[in-house]
């Protein structure tokens, strides 16, 4: 069966294909389907909707699957008329579809697949081949000709991650020129060693991979690393797990397997929480190739951390950073600014905390202002009262790029000295709160530019002191 997968156009220009997108393509390839992909969000993808529709007509797939993400779903919906004219079954997947399946059908999709897609998309293709009812597919929501919707059985989480087709087996489907015009022969790759996160943060939906933590065997991870290196020649790979260190015992097995069986000098980065690392663990991970660790901090005010159910304290953060630097690791910290409960005082405490830990931090995240995504308490608790219900369907919210296609790091950080998300004003900040958010953004930008030796710029020259807070 011919199947076309599309990552729709978006202002966010990607420097590498999404891992989830690769996983779905690999799952279909493994069972014998003829698969093509179009990554219209790639940094150097230049074709328009008419070109995409022409590819659909030429390929004549049995269905077209689109990956939907809340921030850019408006662009995906705008693409649908051209795809509909090409004449094919339209299938929605991805994080936004999992939270809002009915909405995707209302906007023109025939089928919405919720949850982890690797198994459900294969089941959908099988149902089409056999002539079975599409509503028999786990996680499927199927629009009928009369407008009604049939819903399949619930899609459970994939427990045996080793059984999934390795994403690198689909990398040949992605044109390297979409990501790098220099002519490199392979696309960049990353690795997932686990899925799920046990945290309960109010800003995170965690709807696809869930809160239960599942992990791959060490042998499976090592096999993928060796295959990626053989294909690309790269020795550095980012590990994209939401909570890499959530199960410490499995990491000792992984480190041993890496040291024993990886056939090159591996270097990797990881993302985790400050309360689930230890000095011994960081030392062990460094020995296996860890060079960079990113901690989700979110706020420097312990009361805000309690309200957002982060489960981490500022003391945890300081301690984890000290341990990481003692091992010579590069460090990064993510902060979120402007939660509904934030005040000028809580944000000033966050700024002071950033200043306190700055000597231990190589870089702060360039993103900052809180965005309420559907499926999160941050959205559900506030959208009706503050008037941003289904904000993602408004074109005005759909043109700010979280990651602009900027190759120059200096320009990149200048872009984020004033996060455009602040102008969306989801939580109706008063002037003092808005001013403090800008001060926090400014500090992060200055810190990052200073680390790169690029602070000489009039944008970052000292300004008048902040007005005293009441």
Task: Please report, for each region that a protein language model flagged, where it lies by residue.
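Short acidic/polar active-site loop segments enriched in Thr and Asp
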Residues: 62, 110, 234-237, 291, ...
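Hydrophobic/aromatic residues located in beta-strands of well-ordered beta-sheets
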Residues: 3, 90, 137-138, 237, ...
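Radical SAM [4Fe-4S] cluster-binding motif and immediate context
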Residues: 16, 168-332, 339, 352
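Flexible glycine/acidic-rich beta-alpha junction loops that bind and position SAM and/or redox cofactors
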Residues: 12, 101, 199, 249, ...
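Catalytic cores of alpha/beta
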Residues: 102-106, 281, 341-356
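Radical SAM enzyme core and accessory elements
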Residues: 2-8, 29-37, 53-56, 145, ...
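Acidic, low-complexity intrinsically disordered segments
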Residues: 1-224, 231
């Amino acid at each position: 069966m011919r199947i076309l997968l599309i990552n729709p156009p978006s202002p966010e220009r990607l420097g590498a294909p999404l891992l989830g997108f690769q996983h779905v393509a690999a799952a279909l390839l493994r069972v014998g389907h003829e698969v093509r992909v179009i990554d219209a969000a790639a940094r150097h993808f230049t074709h328009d909707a008419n070109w995409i529709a022409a590819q659909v007509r030429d390929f004549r797939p049995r269905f077209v699957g689109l990956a939907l993400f809340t921030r850019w779903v408006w662009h995906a919906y705008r693409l649908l008329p051209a795809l509909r004219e090409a004449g094919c079954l339209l299938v929605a997947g991805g994080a936004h579809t999992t939270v809002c399946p009915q909405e995707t059908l209302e906007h023109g999709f025939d089928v919405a697949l919720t949850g982890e897609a690797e198994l459900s998309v294969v089941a959908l293709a099988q149902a089409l081949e056999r002539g079975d009812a599409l509503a028999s597919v786990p996680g499927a929501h199927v629009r009928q000709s009369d407008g009604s919707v049939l819903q399949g059985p619930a899609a459970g989480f994939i427990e045996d991650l080793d059984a999934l087709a390795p994403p690198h087996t689909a990398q040949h489907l992605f044109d390297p020129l979409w990501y790098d015009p220099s002519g490199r022969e392979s696309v960049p790759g990353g690795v997932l060693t686990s899925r799920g996160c046990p945290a309960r943060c109010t800003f995170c939906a965690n709807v696809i991979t869930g809160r239960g933590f599942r992990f791959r065997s060490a042998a499976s991870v090592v096999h993928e690393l060796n295959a990626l290196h053989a294909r690309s020649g790269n020795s550095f790979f980012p590990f994209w797990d939401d909570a890499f260190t959530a199960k410490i015992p499995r990491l000792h097995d992984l480190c041993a397997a890496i040291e024993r069986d990886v056939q090159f000098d591996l270097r990797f980065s990881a993302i985790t929480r400050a309360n689930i690392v230890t000095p011994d663990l960081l030392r062990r991970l460094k020995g296996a190739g860890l060079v960079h660790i990113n901690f989700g901090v979110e706020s420097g005010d312990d009361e805000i951390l309690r309200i957002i159910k982060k489960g981490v304290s500022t003391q945890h953060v300081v301690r984890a950073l000290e341990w990481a630097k003692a091992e010579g690791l590069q460090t990064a910290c993510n902060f979120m600014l402007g939660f509904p409960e934030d005040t000028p005082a809580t944000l000033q405490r966050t700024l002071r905390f950033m200043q306190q830990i700055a000597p231990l931090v190589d870089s702060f995240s360039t993103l900052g202002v809180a965005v309420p995504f559907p499926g999160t308490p941050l959205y559900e608790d506030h959208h009706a009262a503050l008037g941003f219900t289904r904000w993602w369907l408004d074109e005005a919210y759909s043109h700010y790029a979280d990651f602009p296609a900027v190759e120059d790091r200096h320009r990149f950080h200048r872009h984020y000295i004033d996060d455009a998300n602040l102008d969306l004003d989801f939580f109706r900040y008063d002037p003092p709160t808005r001013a403090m958010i800008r001060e926090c953004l400014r500090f992060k930008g200055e810190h990052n530019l200073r680390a790169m030796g690029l602070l000489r710029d009039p944008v970052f020259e000292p300004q008048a002191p902040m007005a005293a807070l009441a």
